[in-house]
Structure formats: structure tokens, C-alpha cells
Amino acid sequence: MASSRTDPETEPESVFPREIRLFTDSYSESSRFCFCGHELSITQNFGSRLGVAARVWDAALSLCDYFESQNVDFRGKKVIELGAGTGIVGILAALQGGDVTITDLPVALEQIQDNVHANVPPGGRARVCALSWGIDQHVFPGNYDLVLGADIVYLEPTFPLLLGTLRHLCGPHGTIYLASKMRAEHGAETFFRRLLPQHFHLELAQRDEDVNVNIYRARHREVAPAGQHPFC
């Protein structure tokens, strides 16, 4: 679904560099996680090819745990996950009844697809697509009920691209859930305190102190509940 026409200055590889030094050895590891009564088997393909997309990060686990503890209702909802990596968040949403599109850069899609096949039964509504922020988000509809992202706020040059993508994808009555490790050196505070509130009503839904992860909930300004104010 991704557009093949890109500006050389905005090629995904130039904006989302693979951190080849993070995983110099190539190997696969399968881990099991339990959320909402589902046992998920997630394969992580470590190596320089995938880099940070290879592993299940703390923010993804925190977001899955939040969905379980808050009994977030995915039934019949149109859902999209950004920067999915292993796909664990989108897979859980699909198992909980969502009609889910799981996205990342093309290099990560094979890993996601393998995990979808391993966890989502035939007939489950989970599709895997390439999506490069700021380049081809308009290939996707702009009426998602839920937009999900876990640990996708860590490269400041991508922030404007992510904002534009969120603004397009989130439907007028939709909700965005973003879980993020709050790394000061990666600009997370700037994104959530200054940039995102310019376009959305934002609230801190949960703070996981042990792993330094915040979970934020955002909605378009014009449809936010009465009396709600931007997070500051």
C-alpha cells in the first residue's frame, strides 16, 4: 500500500536510520507474553538488518498491560498501529476484536507477518502494510477509531512526519494511544509537552515508573470531552 514515489531527502532510510551497532550478532528469539487471556508467541529477529525494530520494547509491554487493566474495547473498532516492530500491540488489538492494520517500514514487515501468522487465527482481521510517515500516510484512510504506537518517539527529525501522520489517520472521533520511554536525550518530553498538544487534546493516562514509560491518550481538539484541557 505504500507509495513508490518518494523525495530523495525524505527516503525512509535517511530519516529512520537502522542502528547497526545495536545488534551486531544475528539471531532469532521467541518469547511468550500473556495479556487479556491470550498467550502471544513473539519472534524477535535480532541483527543489523532490523535494528531497533527487532525487539519487544518496554513501552509495548506497558501499552498491552494498560489495554488489559483498563479493559479497552477493540470490538468492531478500526485500528492502526504505527512503527509496529514485532507487531505485538496490533496483534493483541486484533485478538481483542479489532479490525487492525499493522504498519512499519518495509524492512520490518516480514517479522510482523510471521508473528501475525503465529498468533492471529484464520479469519482474524489483521493486515500488515508498509507505511512511511510523512510520505504515504494519505494512501490510508483518515477515519481510524484507534491509532496505536509504542516507543516510536525517539528521533527528533521524524517528529513533524509523525505529527502529520497522526493528524491524517485519526478519525474525528478517534483516539490515539502512545506509549513512550521518556528519554530526555531523544526529545520525548518536547514531543509530548510542546508538539503534540498543538494539534490534539492530550492526557497522561498512565505512568510506569519502574521502566520510565508514559502512556498518553490524545483526541482531536474539536471533539475532546467538555472541560478537558491540553496536557502541560
Curated annotation (Swiss-Prot):
Its EC number is 2.1.1.-. S-adenosyl-L-methionine binds at W57, G83, A84, G85, D104, W133, A150. CDD domains: AdoMet_MTases. It comes from the Eukaryota. Keywords: Cytoplasm, Cytoskeleton, Methyltransferase, S-adenosyl-L-methionine, Transferase. Interacts with members of the heat shock protein 70 and 90 families and of the TCP-1 chaperonin family, as well as with HSPD1, STIP1 and tubulin; at least some of these proteins may be methylation substrates. Its main location: cytoplasm. PANTHER family: EEF1A LYSINE METHYLTRANSFERASE 3 (PTHR14614:SF5), HEPATOCELLULAR CARCINOMA-ASSOCIATED ANTIGEN (PTHR14614). This is EEF1A lysine methyltransferase 3. It is found in: Cytoplasm; Cytoplasm, Cytoskeleton, Microtubule organizing center, Centrosome. It catalyses: L-lysyl-[protein] + 3 S-adenosyl-L-methionine = N(6),N(6),N(6)-trimethyl-L-lysyl-[protein] + 3 S-adenosyl-L-homocysteine + 3 H(+); L-lysyl-[protein] + S-adenosyl-L-methionine = N(6)-methyl-L-lysyl-[protein] + S-adenosyl-L-homocysteine + H(+); N(6)-methyl-L-lysyl-[protein] + S-adenosyl-L-methionine = N(6),N(6)-dimethyl-L-lysyl-[protein] + S-adenosyl-L-homocysteine + H(+); N(6),N(6)-dimethyl-L-lysyl-[protein] + S-adenosyl-L-methionine = N(6),N(6),N(6)-trimethyl-L-lysyl-[protein] + S-adenosyl-L-homocysteine + H(+). Pfam families: Methyltransf_16. Protein-lysine methyltransferase that selectively mono-, di- and trimethylates 'Lys-165' of the translation elongation factors EEF1A1 and EEF1A2 in an aminoacyl-tRNA and GTP-dependent manner. EEF1A1 methylation by EEF1AKMT3 is dynamic as well as inducible by stress conditions, such as ER-stress, and plays a regulatory role on mRNA translation. GO terms for cellular component: centrosome; chromosome; cytoplasm; nucleoplasm; protein-containing complex. Gene3D superfamilies: Vaccinia Virus protein VP39. SUPFAM superfamilies: S-adenosyl-L-methionine-dependent methyltransferases (SSF53335). One of its GO terms (biological process) is peptidyl-lysine methylation. GO terms for molecular function: heat shock protein binding; methyltransferase activity; protein-lysine N-methyltransferase activity. Belongs to the methyltransferase superfamily. METTL21 family. The lineage of its organism: Eukaryota, Metazoa, Chordata, Craniata, Vertebrata.
